[in-house]
From Swiss-Prot:
Classification lineage: Eukaryota, Viridiplantae, Streptophyta, Embryophyta, Tracheophyta
InterPro entries reported in the protein's UniProt record: 11S_seedstore_CS (IPR022379), 11S_seedstore_pln (IPR006044), Cupin_1 (IPR006045), RmlC-like_jellyroll (IPR014710), RmlC_Cupin_sf (IPR011051), Seed_Storage-Functional (IPR050253)
Subcellular location: Protein storage vacuole
Record's protein name: Glutelin type-D 1
GO biological process, one term: seed development
């Protein structure tokens, strides 16, 4: 029996890990093809369109019916989780990246086939007036602590939950990839609740293109059969089905969750013990170890992790499958950008992905140009707004007087951008004569254009004082910064 269980566990891990370690599928073909009718002629800034209230928080939905979301193949929500709020366990048909805008707490992911190696012991009193206590031991899979600036990877069909263990609301933005090959259903985000319900959300989104949660999955089973399968009575089965439960899908934990928070030494010891058990029981094959202990959370707000840094302009932190291997399973990447007052970002385009830009703080002026050289967006993005930037569209950004911080979620696990100006840019790579003839300028002008900003990459220092907020021409300045 032990051998059968071990074999089943290994098979499950192998199936789920196949995309994680396989190099046979080209990264450029990691998503289902977009409709040829998609057009990005006029981009717009988005804010949440609808809100669904639960007992301990809100779920805010962006306009998933808009063509830009459907063409980019993304579905975006924002959750506000109140202190002691628990986002009940669930899974989705599509993978997602969750970015922690603010707050702290815990998140759990339950990978199939992985053992429950984390143990904690509780002591409960039956009644307050009683001195009798009962001890019991709980075993579960790893729990991750999250904090502001974290990216949490949520693989498709893997159950997960969030809990706000802090004193202030936690704000989380989720971006789902509905065109992922992990989704074998229709190209829509579908959430399968393991507990609670979302009746109010079902009513609000009755005519929505996306299928939002109603009752949890246990509601679809016969009570007697469910009781027999789980070894519980019918009353308990009805509770699993959340009948007459009006709390929604973000519930309040009255006395807080009692969770184990191991120190680094304890984590290392648990890791060592897990390896010993796997070898001793003959189960170790490399897959279980890598998959069951894979890192699902990483912080990209920490300045020390910046990939590009300009002390006078800002910093950029990139997140790809080399830094965060679970992204191979997700098929998405990210970047966090912090621009100082009036700083610019070198003109660029995304080579292999669409980009979902969410403004965390401050404001930024953005211009986007399409393949015909036409402006498809020219405006200022403010805190809480979102902009979808299509693949290959040229972009230029300039922070306002209050600076800007934003996160960009990319629709591929190894996103790449092509800078127009600065170090390692297109202009730096072109011969002077090519530049001179292409733009009908002298060789000296071409040389200056090529070498301008040669010591900068990504964030650019502002060089032109602003006399008034209304007075400057943004595009003219953008071209001036690269010497044109």
């Amino acid at each position: 029996m032990a051998t059968t269980t071990s074999l089943l566990s290994s098979c499950l891990c192998a199936l789920l890990l196949a995309p994680l370690f396989s190099q046979g599928v080209d990264a450029w073909e990691s998503r289902q093809g977009a409709s040829r009718q998609c057009r990005f002629d006029r981009l717009q800034a988005f804010e949440p369109l609808r809100k669904v209230r639960s007992e301990a928080g809100d779920t805010e939905y962006f306009d998933e019916r808009n063509e830009q979301f459907r063409c980019a193949g993304v579905f975006v929500i924002r959750r506000v989780i109140e202190p002691q709020g628990l986002v009940v366990p669930r899974y989705s048909n599509t993978p997602a990246l969750a970015y922690i805008i603010q707050g702290k707490g815990y998140v759990g992911l339950t990978f199939p086939g992985c053992p429950a190696t984390h143990q904690q012991q509780f002591q409960l009193f039956e009644q307050r007036q009683s001195d009798q206590a009962h001890k019991f031991r709980d075993e579960h899979q790893k729990i991750h602590e999250f904090r502001q600036g974290d990216v949490v990877a949520l693989p498709a069909s893997v159950a997960h939950w969030f809990y706000n263990g802090g004193d202030t609301p936690a704000v989380v933005v989720y971006v789902y990839d509905i065109k992922s090959f992990a989704n074998q259903l229709e190209p829509r985000q579908k959430e399968f609740l393991l507990a609670g319900n979302n009746q109010r959300g079902q009513q609000i989104f009755e005519h929505s293109i996306f299928q939002h949660s109603g009752q949890n999955i246990f509601s679809g089973f016969n009570t007697e059969v469910l009781s027999e399968a789980l070894g519980i009575n019918t009353e308990a089965s009805k509770r699993l089905q959340s009948q007459n439960d009006q709390r929604g899908d973000i519930i309040r934990v009255k006395h807080g969750l009692q969770l184990l928070k191991p120190t680094l030494t304890q984590r290392q010891e648990e890791h060592r013990q897990y390896q010993q058990v796997q070898y001793r029981e003959g189960q170790y094959n490399g897959l279980d170890e890598n998959f069951c202990t894979i890192k699902a959370r990483v912080n990209i707000e920490n300045p020390s992790r910046a990939d590009y840094y300009n002390p006078r302009a800002g910093r950029i932190t990139l997140l790809n499958n080399q830094k965060f291997p679970i992204l191979n399973l997700i098929g998405m990447g990210a970047a966090r950008v912090n621009l100082y007052q009036n700083a610019l970002l070198s003109p660029f385009w995304n080579i292999n992905a669409h980009s979902v830009v969410y403004i965390i703080q401050g404001s930024v002026r953005v211009q986007v140009a399409n393949n015909q050289g036409r402006s498809v967006f020219n405006g200022v993005l403010h805190q809480g707004q979102l902009l979808i930037i299509p693949q290959n569209h040229a972009v230029i950004k300039k922070a306002e007087h209050n600076g800007c911080q934003y996160v960009a979620i990319k629709t591929i696990s190894d996103p790449t951008v092509s800078w127009v100006a600065g170090k390692n840019s297109i202009l730096r790579a072109l011969p002077v004569d090519v530049i001179a003839n292409a733009y009908r300028i002298s060789r000296d002008e071409a040389r200056r254009l090529k070498n301008n900003r040669a010591d900068e990459i990504g964030p650019f220092t502002p060089r032109f004082p602003q006399k008034s907020q209304r007075g400057y021409q943004f595009l003219t300045e953008g071209l001036s910064l690269i010497g044109m």
